[in-house]
Amino acid sequence: MRQKRPNEEPGLIYSRINNPDLEMLEDRLAIWDQAEASLVFASGMAAISTTLWAYARPGTVIIHSGPVYGGTDFLLKKILPQFGVTSIGFLSEGGNRAMEEAVGSARGKGPIAALYIETPANPTNGMVDLKCARKIVSGLHGPDGKRPVIIVDNTMLGPIYQTPLAHVPTWSLRRSLSMSVVIPT
């Protein structure tokens, strides 16, 4: 594998990476979500893991809402710490204050890489205020000096009833039709 050259169309070389159906689905999902692009994964945990690993580095902190899906909880609390990544949670039912307190607690533990939000939460349907999350994160700096990303898993509502990209111009995860979509903007 190599990077494509200028003015080169990479083509479809390996069906697990890309194929005509997958390409069409990703293009249509990007249009549906009003996003620049989209990526389709085989499972929700593949999308979540890929996104978190893209931003987590040893010594960084991921702040997350709670409760979250069990696989995500295991990744945040058992797997990522083995690689020097700390996770700090807050209950979505605690409102904006709980989120602000989690950010305050995280500040002394390392650079904040990401704010991971599952809203509505599964199985409690707890909601997180995405506009407040954006406001809180706007005053922070991640390990690279940039603002930490906000990652939203909106499995329960999808893009018809909830549009995270309209409120949070970072990443959105949506599981539907037994797949996950990560949409960068």
Labelled PLM ranges:
Residues 37-185:
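Conserved PLP-enzyme active-site core in the AAT-like
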